[in-house]
């Protein structure tokens, strides 16, 4: 934690094709070794695959998938009197988005398809249909929070 006041959040610019900040965050998360062009190509190709397979607008499918992945609750370890409790807390909107993108990419990278664009498209389509590994991760997180509801009074 900084001693000299609050650190300003850096604002990301919307991507050129879809004019969306969430897509920019997705591209930034896909990016490895600063290769933004490669990451953009993967993302946009995945969106084209989604449009082909589903017959719907790719952004619509993406937004549905993100809403199905983003968690509402999570647990945070809190140490009280020598015991560590998993305390359920609500997730801030920005963290919800970050976790959703992170879980989606982890799930996509574990898939069996040949290229990353196919994996990402597959995971987004699955997530928009409320299936897939990323949605399962969200459900597991919610179950964990529900199971530890008794410790909610230890909230920060």
Swiss-Prot record:
GO terms for molecular function: mRNA binding; rRNA binding; structural constituent of ribosome; tRNA binding. One of its GO terms (cellular component) is cytosolic small ribosomal subunit. One of its GO terms (biological process) is translation. It holds the Pfam family Ribosomal_S7. Keywords: Ribonucleoprotein, Ribosomal protein, RNA-binding, rRNA-binding, tRNA-binding. It comes from the Bacteria. NCBIfam families: rpsG_bact (TIGR01029). One of the primary rRNA binding proteins, it binds directly to 16S rRNA where it nucleates assembly of the head domain of the 30S subunit. Is located at the subunit interface close to the decoding center, probably blocks exit of the E-site tRNA. Part of the 30S ribosomal subunit. Contacts proteins S9 and S11. Belongs to the universal ribosomal protein uS7 family. This is Small ribosomal subunit protein uS7.
């Amino acid at each position: 934690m900084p001693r000299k006041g609050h650190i300003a959040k850096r604002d990301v610019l919307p991507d050129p094709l879809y004019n969306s900040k969430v897509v920019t965050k997705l591209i930034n998360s896909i990016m490895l070794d600063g290769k933004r062009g490669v990451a953009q190509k993967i993302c946009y190709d995945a969106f084209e695959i989604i449009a082909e397979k589903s017959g719907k607008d790719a952004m619509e499918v993406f937004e549905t998938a993100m809403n199905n992945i983003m968690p509402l609750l999570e647990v945070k370890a809190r140490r009280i009197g020598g015991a560590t409790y998993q305390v359920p807390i609500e997730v801030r909107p920005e963290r919800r988005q970050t976790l959703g993108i992170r879980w989606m990419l982890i799930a996509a990278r574990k898939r069996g398809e040949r290229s990353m664009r196919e994996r990402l498209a597959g995971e987004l389509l699955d997530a928009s249909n409320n299936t897939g590994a990323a949605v399962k991760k969200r459900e597991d997180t919610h179950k964990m929070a529900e199971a530890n509801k008794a410790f909610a009074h230890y909230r920060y």
